[in-house]
């Protein structure tokens, strides 16, 4: 499935992103700088950045689902927190069509703090086979217990306005609600097995994933991918939380400092704009699926 057209688009995007990142990091910046610039750019290939690892997790989730003997009795399910235009939901959908087929059942939930993205996500769903009618957009914040302070509420309004401008969508003045992760799952009646929970929530990851939430996820979520935005000490604490529940750490890379060197990985040196944390549930998919079949009500 790595040769399909949808992955070609992703590779083009990643190549452009990586190239621009390299150029912007050069002192004086500019491709016309000469041989030293060309040498730096030459050593940066293959194209690897934080989104490469996100793509690996998406494709791995689809591959695991394709080998699940109970897949005909449950939909492939992905939740994307901080979804924007639903880029990763679309990627998962394309991979599912390629590996399992367009008739495969699926459930996609995209969550973002910008309500104006709803029309864009719905339009994307119309343009991709299998997404229309199976993709839901939820406008809102996620917080422990679904409760925020007045100070945090003001901060949320600022964040909504800021990202509304970033996404170039209309701001209708809507105040988006705040719910907890279990409330979100109940609200949208998600299946009790979720193949992938993908979170890119601009530093809120450290408050969303509490001990109680990780415990809940252990009973129902197969794989978690988190784009991290913290600094020294924050990622290890989050990693320890999952490992305390026996999750396996698949990827763990802190974000790069602007002046610091690229971080070594098994794929070569990488400069991470966001950090990467990826976890795999110790409970195998058949175990989760069997529990789902025995449960008369949703796990949430």
What are these regions (language model features)?
Residues 1-300:
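Phosphate/nucleotide-binding beta-alpha loop and adjacent structural elements of enzyme active sites
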